Amino acid sequence: MGGKNKIEILFQLQSALSRRRISSLVDFRRVFPPETPNHKNNITLSRFHFLGTHFLHSLGAPDKFPNRFNDDKDKQSALDVHNIIKHHRGSSPEKIKRILDKCGIDLTEELVLEVVNRNRSDWKPAYILSQLVVKQSVHLSSSMLYNEILDVLGKMRRFEEFHQVFDEMSKRDGFVNEKTYEVLLNRYAAAHKVDEAVGVFERRKEFGIDDDLVAFHGLLMWLCRYKHVEFAETLFCSRRREFGCDIKAMNMILNGWCVLGNVHEAKRFWKDIIASKCRPDVVSYGTMINALTKKGKLGKAMELYRAMWDTRRNPDVKICNNVIDALCFKKRIPEALEVFREISEKGPDPNVVTYNSLLKHLCKIRRTEKVWELVEEMELKGGSCSPNDVTFSYLLKYSQRSKDVDIVLERMAKNKCEMTSDLYNLMFRLYVQWDKEEKVREIWSEMERSGLGPDQRTYTIRIHGLHTKGKIGEALSYFQEMMSKGMVPEPRTEMLLNQNKTKPRVEDKMLRSNLTSEESESD
């Protein structure tokens, strides 16, 4: 980091920390005053894995009530509440409560949770339901519902309502928990409210939650997740005496720089790790190798990969897959196959991703015999090596005739692999290119029956295919149908059809001009 930037970040951090001393949870809103609302994902710490990070958009539907809404009556009640709020979203909570009473609907924790999860992209129902929970004194067995509502409000950047709900939640003893902490960190970091995110960490003890290294990891993770890597590094340096030299925290910051694509800073921080008491582990190497391969620095990546074996830090299958894919991308197929042979012999065991990386590039260069040899090997091994929809997408993409498609479909059936919208669209594109109109209509009908389409991609393929054949009227008809379904066309599709809409007008003008000339000559 530049010296000036580092000083600014450190000053910002010190300012943030100096404002974090408050006496009670009720003062939360005084520290984070409501701002002008602005219309505009969530994981648990145990789900965070480098090189295989699963960032969920939200907390998702919880498993606390696995047997909820088993009968039609419960489902209908949820739908009724959803519709009432939808049609009366501008009404007061009191009015909505009266409507619910007239309909004989008693809100329960499970019912409210179901309705909230039906409206994860709309803040208003979540906020209304939070008010109804208070007005109807709905019994809550845990903080799960409040966490879900906070998550939705934070996601939509409705921080005035967010703070109001948190204030209400704080009045309930023991409701602010680790999950609440995650939601607060996630949503503040996502909205680039760095001060507030640090403040949440500083006041964990006021929430009745232990202040520990795992919580600090969570703060660093969310800051890096939303590109505040420089701030996260400065924060880590300022807390090094408290938490010591921690390779997991350093890996998070290294990963943050790599995700930003800043290889220069990643290399600098890598040297810091080497120079520290912490020794780089498999995650450190994997993160750095991933960054180098993405930037096309395959030579340096291979040096690190070989160094892992030499120092007995054996790479895991994700690192090996990354190396194989990078070698294939650079058209160094023999070297990729050699790495594949090595790990097949001494580990780690290859998985379906390993095979798919090879298949993608082997299909591209038409190494058909080797492709089917690997597919048969996958089928023989089974388990984590079994062919999946990605496998068959590569086989379909490079099919050259209808017979090839039939062979792939037979293989899919043999492996009990279900069709996906991606696979349907691949087949659809092939049949359009081959001018197999009967097959085109057949795939279209199958997509409608299965509920997997036709989607925006299907319409785009169809429209461009018809345009190529000069069937402009039919192409325009499909375009209008696509628009009527609320699908957003690609710019190239709009340009294509707009050009054709103007052409008849130009021709009409020319025709009128010619007629006028002829008439004047006859006069």
Curated annotation (Swiss-Prot):
Pfam family, any one: PPR
Region Disordered, annotated ranges: 497-523
Keywords: Repeat
Any one of the GO CC terms: cytosolic ribosome
InterPro entries cross-referenced by the UniProt entry: Pentatricopeptide_rpt (IPR002885), PPR_P_subfamily (IPR050872), TPR-like_helical_dom_sf (IPR011990)
Residue spans of the PPR repeats: 142-172, 177-211, 212-242, 246-280, 281-315, 316-350, 351-385, 388-418, 420-454, 455-489
Family membership noted in the UniProt record: Belongs to the PPR family. P subfamily.
UniProt name for this protein: Putative pentatricopeptide repeat-containing protein At3g15200
Species of origin: Arabidopsis thaliana
Origin organism lineage: Eukaryota, Viridiplantae, Streptophyta, Embryophyta, Tracheophyta
